Amino acid sequence: MPSIKIRENEPFEIAIRRFKRACEKAGVLSEVRRREYYEKPTEERKRKAAAAIKRHLKKLSRERFALQNLRKGRPQQ
């Protein structure tokens, strides 16, 4: 669980904002949402496999786009 130390003369709103940022960075909310309901091991494997395929296709798409731009002589973005 993320924790912060409240600085001297620090407004409460700013401390809350820092705490929220720390929680987001640690992935607390996404972990809570993931654990809200039980997920069967087979469903978890399917979800992870689908995510891996999606990442792979996204990477291929980016590479193809970059290759097309190189062939056309356009600078990369």
Curated annotation (Swiss-Prot):
Single Gene Ontology MF annotation: structural constituent of ribosome
Protein name stated in the entry: Small ribosomal subunit protein bS21
InterPro entries: Ribosomal_bS21, Ribosomal_bS21_CS, Ribosomal_bS21_sf
Keyword annotations: Ribonucleoprotein, Ribosomal protein
Primary gene name: rpsU
Membership in a protein family: Belongs to the bacterial ribosomal protein bS21 family.
Top-level taxon: Bacteria
Pfam family, one: Ribosomal_S21
A cellular-component GO term for this protein: ribonucleoprotein complex
Species annotation: Methylococcus capsulatus (strain ATCC 33009 / NCIMB 11132 / Bath)
GO biological process entries: translation
